[in-house]
């Protein structure tokens, strides 16, 4: 198939540091190319891909201090997509909602994966105005706040199986927190859990400008107060395997409707179990007492850390291999692309089809 992947321009594909959406687009694109499809990637000019790259900005917008407004760059990208649209069987958008007016006339050959939270009140009237645009959720939980829209599938994220090495015997005896310093990610909970169990905590996270006050006023004082807490800062892909692989567990103590939580499957790829609070997509990603523990309170989180020895790291990795590889993700999307190309208007959620006996990597037309 001739497939266009349209990525955000904020980070390169794949991102140098933080950037979950761009990382997923990278793994999907590379796997589609590996399977022999003709893939074109619309992304920043510094992106690295096996697909044909259409550069839509010189570099990732977040890394360019001259960029004051990202919207014009994305609109220019959409104009280029519109110009080339007839050359593709499928246009797969990963840029939230900017393209919706454009794709109404192309709805039969487009899909849009929504990567972010959908519970913001401003979004409800917008999505209600576009009930014909085919949408893909990255978890069933992500859909809950939405008005009736044209959901065609749920496709869970996946990663290339060799991107993060399995570690059977971690060299560290620490807990890990990886991602972003923000109130909804609850690094304060991670610090409290580590203090209560008496284990070191390593925090590898970025601090956005929007969260600078939260870091300075809330989290940095806690880091200074507890000698067992080490703040590493933002790490790159090459550092992530060692950081996660040598941890006893990843702490994922969120209290917001996390649409997916890519870091959870990154930890699982390393064989590292996850202790996660029951929010958002967590119950869809973590197999309780298999790849980690799902908890509802600080007391349960502390108990889960004490019970980590019950979990086998080989089983954690096997769960990743069964559920969260890039091949499984690409196969799910290909089933969807083909169903839509064949005129299907609705497709069952991918994992719902699996649970009903359709088998892994399959979508069923509803």
Residue ranges of each PLM-predicted region?
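Catalytic cores of nucleotide-sugar-dependent glycosyltransferases that transfer UDP/GDP/TDP-activated
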Residues: 1-366
């Amino acid at each position: 198939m001739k497939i266009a992947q349209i990525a955000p321009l904020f980070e390169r594909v794949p991102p140098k540091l933080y950037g979950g959406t761009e990382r997923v687009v990278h793994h999907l694109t590379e796997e589609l190319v590996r399977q022999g499809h003709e893939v074109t990637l619309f992304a920043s000019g510094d992106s690295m891909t096996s697909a044909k790259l259409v550069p839509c900005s010189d570099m990732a917008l977040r890394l360019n201090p001259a960029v004051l407004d990202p919207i014009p760059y994305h609109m220019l990208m959409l104009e280029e997509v519109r110009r080339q649209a007839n050359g593709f069987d499928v246009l797969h958008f990963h840029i939230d909602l900017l393209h919706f007016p454009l794709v109404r006339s192309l709805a039969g050959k487009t899909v849009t994966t929504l990567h972010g939270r959908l519970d913001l009140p401003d979004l409800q009237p917008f999505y209600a105005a576009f009930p014909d645009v085919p949408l893909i959720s990255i978890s069933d939980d992500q859909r809950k706040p939405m008005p009736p829209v044209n959901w065609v599938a749920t496709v869970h994220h996946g990663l290339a199986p060799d991107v993060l090495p399995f570690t059977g015997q971690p060299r560290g005896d620490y807990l890990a927190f990886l991602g972003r310093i923000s109130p909804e990610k609850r690094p304060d909970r991670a610090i409290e859990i580590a203090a209560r169990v008496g284990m070191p905590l390593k925090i590898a996270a970025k601090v956005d400008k929007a969260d600078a006050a939260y870091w300075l006023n809330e989290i940095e004082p806690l880091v200074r107060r507890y000698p067992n807490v080490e703040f590493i800062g933002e790490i790159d892909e090459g550092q992530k395997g060692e950081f996660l692989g040598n941890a006893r567990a990843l702490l994922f103590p969120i209290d917001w409707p996390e649409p997916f939580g890519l870091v959870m499957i990154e930890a699982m790829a390393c064989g590292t179990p996850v202790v996660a609070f029951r929010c958002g997509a967590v119950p869809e990603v973590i197999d309780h007492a298999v790849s980690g523990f799902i908890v509802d309170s600080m007391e349960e989180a502390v108990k889960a850390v004490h019970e980590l020895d019950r979990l086998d790291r080989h089983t954690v990795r096997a769960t990743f291999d069964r559920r969260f590889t890039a091949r499984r993700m690409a196969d799910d999307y290909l089933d969807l692309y083909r169903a839509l190309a064949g005129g299907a208007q609705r497709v069952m959620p991918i994992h719902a089809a699996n649970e009903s006996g359709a088998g892994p990597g399959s979508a069923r037309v509803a």
